[in-house]
Amino acid sequence: MTVTTFDPYSEIVYDTNNDHGISSTTYPKLSEEFGDNHYGRANGLISAFKINKDTYNWQVADYKIEDENDLVIYELLLRDFTDNSYGEGSVKAAMEYLDYLKTLGVNAIELMPIQEFEGNISWGYSTHAYFAMDKAYGTRNDYKAFIDACHQKGMAVILDVVYNHATGAHPYAAMYWDGYANKTASNNPWFNVDATHQYSVNHQWNHSNQMVREHVKRNLEYLIKEYKVDGFRFDLTKGFTQNSNLIEDYNAERVGYLKEYAYHIECVDNNAIMICEHFVDSENWDLGAAGIKVWRNMNDPYIKSMKRDMSVADFRGMTQSFDGNSGMQNDYMAFGTLVGYMESHDEERTNYAGQWSYNGSEIPFATRIERAKANAAFFLLTPGPKMIWQFGEIGYDISILEGGDRTAKKPWRTDDYMKVAERKSLYDTYSMLLKFRKDNPRFFDNDVNFRWYVDGSHGTGRYMYARSGEGKHFALFANFGTGNQTISVSLPEGVGTWYDYNTGSAWNGRSHSPYMAEGQFYLLVSDRNMCRQ
């Protein structure tokens, strides 16, 4: 049987079935570049190359992440990040909002998958060409210009990469096709016939095959060298195994593959980082020791907090393992292993869920925004890297299921939301907290003495204290209760006078009982010079 397919190493792949849906604004002269006559004669995915391909003159050739353990990452879906009313968001459009992100205070941007994927309207997790950037968001030089502009503004760029699976259009799946079963054949050395775990979609890569691992490593190296990316978020790394009995448990095979990829990334660029969507707590220690970071999903407790369900809203998982049997508290993991988040692309939006209390009653909009501010404080001021999902900073309250599907296009609201005083105030609070984090890095180093009291046993108050290695202190406390109330707080010993970070006003002594509005928080510091005013 003859199989017509494209070169898996092609840097550009034309799609005769979907390219017509890409606007000339996003990708100028696309039909001219490929040729309208080819679109008429060819069918499917087509490789192309250019003998004298366009060059890009980098303005920043040697950008380096300053501190990988103090990253504040902004996860971004290009499709929905900018106005998509009349088409799709694009790389060029996203560049116009880099100042918005810089002012917010993030120092890294994580792009959801941008390697050539199935169709044009997608989250991007249906990759079929790993060396080609998807044209639905722009040209190759557009992507480079975006990364270059991020670097000029002091922001790293992390790519979300999908090596658990690929679509059946990938050449290594298509060349070994079982037409009767409509899936890849049993003699395929690259892909498994059936996935070894229940989380997979499309066709699962067989990472036990050295050819597969070399293919992945070659792709990682290409992305670093060609596009100057600063790291990767690996999708669904729990699936990197042939042993279906050890999907949820410690799996030395899987750990070995991930360490091999991390080592190769380090050899190419020892400043580049690797983050895994992993969710196997028993492996976090080994991965962290190898310099690999892992996602820490804290969506549930922060949603409970938004819904006033404080008896079960426990934030402690942000800084420690969930696995009580292993005893692997954060002290036993490499510092900075956990990349914590309140939301990612996969979870319900906290500000949508927070429209209603746990008992079903509606929470007023202004109150909900104040609770979102308190959540942000008790998220962003914890040590270790953090991730913000797009628009959480302006209280995006449209459900993940809007449009009938989690992956459907979502309405763009940034410009309108920024005109709403309460939402702008939430953005400003994020910016203030991230400025505090940037201006006081010693509070977020591995030698910080950090304590927080944030489980249900502490009622509707929540408290956080930190002492840096240089002997400075901050204290944070909030009213997470329903309505205004008095919150009693006993500040740590050793500081005579505390100062309100935002106003500079003095707080003398240890014991205080301020009357606080719902969602109100105080950030106190031990040195007047640390204050904003």
Predicted regions and their residues:
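The feature marks proteins involved in alpha-glucan
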Residues: 1-71, 86, 520-522
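Short, polar loop/linker segments at the starts of domains and inter-domain junctions
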Residues: 84-97, 354-363, 404, 506-516
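Active-site regions of oxyanion-processing enzymes, predominantly non-cytosolic
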Residues: 102, 230-234, 386-392
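Substrate-binding/active-site clefts of carbohydrate-active enzymes
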Residues: 9, 19, 38, 55-68, ...
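Active-site-proximal helices and loops of the catalytic beta/alpha 8
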Residues: 113-115, 123-126, 151-153, 236-341, ...
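Conserved interdomain hinge at the start of the Helicase C-terminal
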Residues: 372-373
